Design a protein with these regions (language model features):
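Conserved mixed alpha/beta catalytic, RNA-binding, or beta-rich assembly cores of soluble enzyme
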Residues: 13-15, 169, 184-200
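Active-site-proximal beta-strand/loop segments in catalytic clefts of secreted hydrolases
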Residues: 10, 46-48, 111-113, 189
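Short, active-site-adjacent cap segments at secondary-structure transitions
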Residues: 13-15, 49-53, 115-118, 193-195
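Short, basic, glycine/proline-bearing loop/turn elements
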Residues: 12-20, 155-162, 196-200
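Ligand-binding beta-strand-loop-alpha-helix segment within the catalytic cores
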Residues: 62-185
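N-terminal glycine-/serine-/threonine-rich phosphate-binding loop
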Residues: 1-45, 54-64, 73, 177-182
Length: 200
């Protein structure tokens, strides 16, 4: 059977802005295309913390202009980030493969992971997202929206969210089927969107 390779791209590998990301994925695409040329089955995962923070901030700023607008939860911001990072990766990898004469499909799967609803991180969130706020802004976010915030190395305050440990991947069979069918798959961006099981 073919060798399976998981490529994990950290946030520094994706850049801090959209133009930086579009440039950065070209370098990643060359390395990934090398693996495909070596006849490996390739699955790509990636960080999304800066991107989720950017989307979250944009949605918050929009909400300030339009107070009736419902704020997007972190799960939705995470899904948005998986979508646009996957979009850039797909395009860069596909272009690199075609340049090498390889006609291999590339696809992104929006991925959810089952977590324990009592995971410690829900009670002690530590994953920072969004922009740096003043104490006044942070206090307002805590009072109005119930955000958890921490002081960030003396620079100001940041929102913190839970980053629970994944127990299983909901779309795992889809990922397996696509990899076995020969696709290059982008999945589990940001570790996946956390969800938990309920009764019924």
């Amino acid at each position: 059977s073919k060798k399976k390779v998981v490529v994990a791209l950290g946030h520094k590998a994706l850049g801090a802005t959209l133009p930086q990301q579009q440039d950065a994925v070209k370098g990643a695409a060359k390395a990934i295309a090398d693996l495909v040329e070596a006849d490996c089955q390739v699955i790509i995962s990636h960080s999304n913390a800066p991107q989720v923070g950017m989307i979250h901030t944009a949605m918050n700023e929009f909400g300030k202009q339009h107070p009736d607008y419902t704020f997007a939860p972190i799960s939705v911001c995470s899904a948005m980030s998986q979508g646009y990072i996957g979009y850039d990766l797909q395009n860069a990898i596909r272009e690199e493969l075609l340049n090498r004469g390889i006609n291999r499909p590339v696809a992104t799967i929006l991925t959810q992971v089952v977590v324990n609803p009592y995971d410690d991180s829900f009670y002690k969130p530590v994953k920072v997202i969004g922009r740096i706020m003043t104490k006044e802004e942070a206090d307002k976010m805590v009072a109005e929206r119930g955000y958890n915030v921490i002081e960030d190395a003396g620079r100001g305050y940041r929102r913190v969210v839970a980053s629970p440990r994944p127990q299983s991947i909901i779309e795992i069979q889809s990922i397996r089927d696509m990899v076995e069918a020969g696709l290059v798959v982008v999945a589990c961006g940001g570790g996946g969107i956390p969800v938990y099981k309920t009764e019924g």
